[in-house]
């Protein structure tokens, strides 16, 4: 049996279609998704990337994605790609560019 690991979910949405369908800025849906992911144990790391705060089973992450689809049906027509990755060691490199974390 595999041990639980932190998981990363990344996705890409068709922002043009979102703006046409949602009657406004695509930022609204991204803000709502961020809140949803936060409520479900994921931290926003950048753009459309989220990492689980704690180790979890892949089945739990998949259930979160299913709930995300239910909460935001527009995703069924606007998701261009979505990936789930098991996170190993992570190293913060932002400081190499003179940016404080």
Regions found by a protein language model. Give the residues of each.
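Generic enzyme active-site microenvironment
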Residues: 10-12
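Basic nucleic-acid-binding interfaces
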Residues: 1-7, 16-85, 90-101
């Amino acid at each position: 049996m595999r041990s639980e690991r932190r998981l990363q979910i990344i996705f890409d949405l068709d922002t043009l279609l979102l703006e046409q369908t949602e009657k406004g800025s695509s930022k609204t849906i991204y803000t709502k998704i961020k809140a949803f992911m936060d409520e479900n144990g994921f931290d926003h790391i950048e753009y459309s990337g989220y990492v689980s705060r704690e180790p979890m089973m892949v089945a739990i992450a998949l259930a979160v994605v299913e709930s995300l689809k239910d909460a935001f049906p527009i995703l069924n027509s606007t998701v261009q790609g979505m990936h789930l990755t098991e996170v190993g060691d992570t190293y913060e490199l932002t400081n190499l560019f003179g940016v404080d974390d």
